[in-house]
Amino acid sequence: LLMWNTSLDVFKQFTLAGVGTGDYDDVLTAKNESYGNSGVAKHRYNSHNQFLNTMVQLGLLGLVVLIMLFLNGFKMAYQQRNIIGILTLSCFFLNFLFESFIETQAGIILFCLLPLALFHLKPKAYL
């Protein structure tokens, strides 16, 4: 929760467009050092919340895009009666609350390709 509070404080300073993806670690580390969180600053921890990371990096605009990806995905899955798609997106959404999932290359690939593959399958209607 310490990192969540720090991330929210940084977001308040850079609300619209964020600090940028390249400056994220430096800005968060500097903010932690200014708060006296030397252990957190030393290890350069992120917030372990993808929504907060996106807010700090890309601002409100980036957060809106990320949320729209989920909303559009849920809408498509519901319209196609794709329960596997709904469950997959739900798992991603819950994971994003407690982990910075798309901060790594493996996370990006999984987040992009798995839903894409699931929405092109033609499952039986379960809903």
What are these model-derived regions, one by one?
Residues 85-97, 101-127:
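Transmembrane alpha-helices of multi-pass inner-membrane enzymes
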Residues 21-25, 62-65, 110:
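Short, flexible micro-motifs
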Residues 57-90:
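Hydrophobic transmembrane alpha-helices and their immediate junctions
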Residues 1-5, 9, 17-58:
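Long extracytoplasmic/lumenal interhelical loops at the membrane interface
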Residues 47, 55-59, 102-110:
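Membrane-interface micro-motifs in multi-pass membrane enzymes
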